[in-house]
A protein has these predicted regions:
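Conserved small/polar residues in nucleotide/adenosyl-binding loops
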Residues: 137-144
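N-terminal secretory targeting modules
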Residues: 1-27, 32-40, 45, 49-59, ...
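Short beta->alpha junction loops
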Residues: 64-72
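Oxyanion-hole/transition-state-stabilizing segment in secreted/luminal serine hydrolases
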Residues: 13, 17, 25-27, 33, ...
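A short helix->loop->beta-strand "cap" motif at the edges of active sites that frequently abuts
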Residues: 120-126
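Generic structural signal for well-ordered alpha-helices
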Residues: 110-115
Length: 144
């Protein structure tokens, strides 16, 4: 996978500046869903969508939120088509950072999500969001 190709984002911004109709999608868990937001408009997904609306007023945007609390990329790869991709998105942000564990199986399912998005016929710009944290252990080995 190429982790540093901005061509799809540049094309998305070009199309938005040209006034095209675009679909902005999100796939993830509870953070994407908007859990614990004080109101729906404060959820990160809606705020990103609203940024597109405010920045490119000449375009019409559709908002697709495929966030379901408590789900990981294992479930996300299975529902990517029905929850987001069937709407032919031009942009998809992905966040499973809280629910995915750092184990090979989850890394494979996360990669499956990314590959599914990148190979979808609408060629969406894909932005991956991750939460980086470190568990502190008092013993020399995390397994002790």
């Amino acid at each position: 996978m190429n982790t540093s190709n901005f061509a799809r984002l540049k094309e998305l911004f070009r199309r938005a500046a040209a006034g095209q109709e675009l679909t902005i999608g999100f796939l993830g868990g509870s953070i994407t869903q908007g859990s614990l937001s004080t109101q729906p408009g404060n959820a990160y997904a809606f705020r990103v969508y609203q940024w597109f609306v405010d920045t490119f007023p000449q375009s019409k945007f559709h908002y697709v939120n495929g966030g379901i609390g408590g789900t990981s990329s294992h479930y996300g790869v299975a529902r990517a088509v029905t929850d987001v991709l069937m709407y032919q998105p031009d942009f998809v942000a992905v966040d499973f950072s809280v629910n995915d564990l750092e184990v090979p199986f989850r890394q494979e399912t996360y990669e499956g999500v990314v590959r599914k998005l990148l190979t979808w016929p609408s060629h969406p710009a894909v932005v991956l969001l991750n939460n980086i944290y470190c568990l502190l252990y008092t013993s020399p080995s995390p397994r002790d």
